[in-house]
């Protein structure tokens, strides 16, 4: 014969033990996680991230440029999908973030994404000069050094062709001018990326 209320006491007792075990584990786990987090950070810093490839066999994500003067950006990877917007700027750099058969999901400098047919994209590299900096012009330098002489001043959002990038500096060409720009001031190349044309 069961005692009255015994079942509910067992349930409450079990719940209290579970909560207590969770608190003890949380306190113990947080101390041990601090050391393992530091070790994980050291390991991550010394190991390169795995390279992801798309249907084309090329690395994802990667930067390319628009090959045509008019490029329809669709909501999905087929001609049946609605056109979300149209790019009208040949040479504009975009980032390929995914692939599906012959379609490429691209991202622009403002973060908008959509699908484009692969033949409308070029492997040629281009950049936008500091599109996030507003109206502040950026110096195109004679050499890859902060103290070098300016060849020209570039407005934010100006497009340029990439000649080469060292990982810290990029040599770009724009309207008959060639020079160097701090790589972190460009959209269309990754930080630390080396580019040879």
Residue ranges and their predicted role:
Residues 1-6:
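N-terminal secretory signal peptides that target proteins for export/translocation
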Residues 16:
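Localized chelating/binding microdomains
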Residues 80:
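Short, electropositive, low-hydrophobicity segments enriched in small/polar residues
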Residues 8-12, 20, 24-72, 86-90, ...:
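SH3-family beta-barrel domains
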């Amino acid at each position: 014969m069961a005692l009255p209320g015994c079942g509910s006491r067992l349930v409450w007792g079990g719940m209290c033990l579970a909560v207590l075990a969770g608190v003890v584990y949380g306190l113990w786990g947080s101390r041990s996680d601090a050391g393992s987090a530091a070790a994980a950070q050291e390991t991550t810093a010394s190991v390169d991230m795995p390279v992801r490839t798309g249907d084309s066999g090329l690395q994802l994500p990667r930067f390319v440029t628009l090959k045509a003067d008019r490029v329809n950006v669709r909501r999905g990877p087929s001609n049946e999908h609605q056109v979300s917007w149209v790019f009208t700027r040949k040479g504009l750099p975009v980032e390929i973030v995914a692939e599906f058969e012959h379609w490429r999901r691209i991202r622009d400098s403002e973060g908008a994404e959509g699908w484009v047919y692969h033949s409308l994209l070029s492997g040629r590299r281009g950049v936008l000069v500091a599109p996030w900096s507003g109206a502040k012009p950026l110096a195109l330098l004679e050499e890859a050094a902060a103290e070098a002489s300016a060849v020209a001043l570039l407005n934010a959002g100006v497009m340029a062709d990439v000649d080469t990038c060292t990982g810290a500096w990029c040599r770009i060409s724009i309207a008959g001018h060639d020079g160097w720009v701090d790589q972190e001031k460009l959209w269309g190349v990754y930080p630390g990326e080396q580019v040879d044309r």
